């Protein structure tokens, strides 16, 4: 039994037909419920729900205050390498792209860590392209050992691993895993992942579960919004989070809502996701899964991110560069995508305070 | 108001305050100072000694007793490690045991809580375990050295008040160490109710931190807790199911009387 069984239940479900049938009074009734079922959640992604955004926002804010209070956790990503063996249609790291490749040495990792640590951040997310040759688990274990000197919480966003490899990294000091399915629709998945190990839909889909079995502390999942109809992808993301939470009670779950951003390469077959759509997805997640953390990255512009804070965002990145070696300004490798919110950690801290929320630099420590 | 004792320490204020969820540490500080609490709990995992503005300890008045909690612990072993770390970091000997392996409802794991309490009490900690109200577990916590027992009124953050009232009432009757109602208290009137029942104290966080005006709300809780304790000491008048004057079953005996 894995989440794939749940996916199959809905594979041939007439999502669009269902969404068309939802009426505004249905949505307003669902908002008041204590516990939503799968169809309630799907209804919150309907066109009728788009007309009830203010009511949804009020409820989402109430639930966010109850579970998280007026706090936003800050973290930043550190790109270790942009070597990748996959051919993903939407990603600059695609092996076919002529970008400047780079992998940080251990000395460079330490230099980057020192510079980031000076900003006061205690939570770090280590990222790599997907290459077992350039960035094997042994390399990551060493990187984590360096990070432990500077940070209290270390998460990874890398290629999917076997349970034993997750265990090795957890023993080294990793407490969080971020892994996006990118697109839940299996057919679309095959269309945008043209070659490479990432083409293995199932191995990626079950990766969060393998990390849970390895006893990781927190897991962050998401779909790359824009690769398929957002209603379908948001629904499956929420269902996946719900599945993991019910099966692994002690794991803290987070959801991200990354929208596709400009990148190197020619992929233009994007399903549009407007700001309003993004807000609707965010609110639906919060109402369906009030206890999960919601992450909003610097893919989104600063003014939009600020407005999303009171709606249920609980984690935000700050002081971001997606270039390998981007913090220490040395010999950089090219970035994965263009970011939109370029504010420094200090600027983000002030922006969060201005919204009447408390920026949290440390919310976890390895015990 | 008469004080009460935890672990040999005499306390005047019966309101303990939690520090999560505030919009800023300045606001938290004002709320703490305004309500006169003497015990403040904070998650050790959030203590950030390296960053002055993010270091919660900078905002907790110096004469307050720190009650570090083990929030984030999923089993006894993790809770024990956090408590020891807390002591090593200079946060004192008091510890609130929170062992939560359910991230959805945040309900405590009573069994693991007993295990952690036993180990830490032996090591000289003043242990205040947060628990799901259950008499047998409360007795075990008491017997392994808990300095107080902290049953939940309703799940953390729900503000639903004393949903477990009857179980708490039994704990108050049967347990000798102080009963401090923790979690779920959403309004001052609910805190007063807990105190009227005979709880020694209450711990409040979300209801203060997420109120529109946390400073005023903290003060309101202080007054409610005092009122509730006074009412308990004054012994409330008994309730009657029917008005004393009416005698629906025997009234006929008096029919015809003037």
Curated annotation (Swiss-Prot), chain B:
GO biological process: thiamine diphosphate biosynthetic process
Location(s) in or outside the cell: Cytoplasm
Binding-site residues for 1-deoxy-D-xylulose 5-phosphate, renumbered to this chain: 157, 183-184, 205-206
Catalytic residues (UniProt): 96
Residues making up the signal peptide according to the UniProt record: none
Swiss-Prot/TrEMBL catalytic activity: [ThiS sulfur-carrier protein]-C-terminal-Gly-aminoethanethioate + 2-iminoacetate + 1-deoxy-D-xylulose 5-phosphate = [ThiS sulfur-carrier protein]-C-terminal Gly-Gly + 2-[(2R,5Z)-2-carboxy-4-methylthiazol-5(2H)-ylidene]ethyl phosphate + 2 H2O + H(+)
Molecular function via GO: thiazole synthase activity
Presence of the UniProt keyword Transferase in the record: yes
EC number, as in UniProt: 2.8.1.10
UniProt entry keywords in alphabetical sequence: Cytoplasm, Schiff base, Thiamine biosynthesis, Transferase
Gene3D superfamilies referenced in this protein's UniProt entry, alphabetically: Aldolase class I
Biological or metabolic pathway of the protein: Cofactor biosynthesis; thiamine diphosphate biosynthesis
EC class of the enzyme, as a word: transferase
Subunit structure: Homotetramer. Forms heterodimers with either ThiH or ThiS.
This protein's name: Thiazole synthase
Gene name of the record: thiG
